[in-house]
UniProtKB/Swiss-Prot annotation:
Protein name as it appears in the record: UPF0235 protein YggU
InterPro entries found in the cross-reference section: DUF167, YggU-like_sf
CC annotations in GO: cytoplasm
Name of the gene encoding the protein in the UniProt record: yggU
Domain of life according to the entry: Bacteria
Matches recorded under Pfam families: DUF167 (PF02594)
Organism: Salmonella typhimurium (strain LT2 / SGSC1412 / ATCC 700720)
Length: 96
């Protein structure tokens, strides 16, 4: 499975999360996953909620449209984005 997969109602992303980064950003490919740096610490679900908020802004969807399918407690996650309104250029380059 590739880092970004299209499905009938959106996109499925395989992510590697770097918590406690200096800024929020989509870094690029990390092996067969997309690396995302976020500023939140990995404590009490703060990183997950910050990740859904960050992805919501990037794809212009509500936080409820972002589902963490796998990896709730780890750095390796599989996230589904339902009906994205826009696709960031870093992700669009990986779908081709």
């Amino acid at each position: 499975m590739s880092a970004v997969t299209r499905c009938e109602d959106g996109l499925v992303l395989r992510l590697y999360i770097q918590p406690k980064a200096s800024r929020d950003s989509i870094v690029g490919l990390h092996g067969d996953e997309v690396k995302i740096a976020i500023t939140a610490p990995p404590v009490d679900g703060q990183a997950n909620s910050h990740l859904t908020k960050f992805l919501g802004k990037q794809f212009r969807v509500a936080k409820s449209q972002i589902v963490i399918e796998k990896g709730e407690l780890g750095r390796h996650k599989q996230v589904k984005i339902i009906h994205p309104q826009q696709i960031p250029p870093e992700i669009a380059a990986l779908t081709e």
